[in-house]
UniProtKB/Swiss-Prot annotation:
Disulfide bonds: none annotated. NCBIfam families: PRK13689.1. It comes from Salmonella typhimurium (strain LT2 / SGSC1412 / ATCC 700720). Belongs to the UPF0352 family. This is UPF0352 protein YejL.
Length: 75
């Protein structure tokens, strides 16, 4: 996802690498990985964001996700 963030690219990449390592360690297929990551996002929003802002944060996250998806045929 494109990021306009107060976090360094290095910090983001380190967390991403560690999360991917956990999924690989458990040999999680794509559908399970997406389910777990989606549940993680839901949990973060529900436990860390004020109720009045949850829908806006979820919509913003969904738009950022959609805009970051590549349309090429490689996978």
């Amino acid at each position: 996802m494109p990021q306009l963030s107060r976090y360094s690219d290095e910090h983001v990449e380190q967390l991403l690498s560690e999360l991917l390592s956990v999924l690989e360690k458990h040999k999680a297929p794509t559908d399970l990985s997406l389910m777990v990551l989606g549940n993680m996002v839901t949990n973060l929003i529900n436990t860390s964001v004020a109720p009045a802002q949850r829908q806006a944060i979820a919509n913003s996250f969904a738009r950022a996700l959609q805009s970051s998806i590549s349309e090429d045929n490689a996978h």
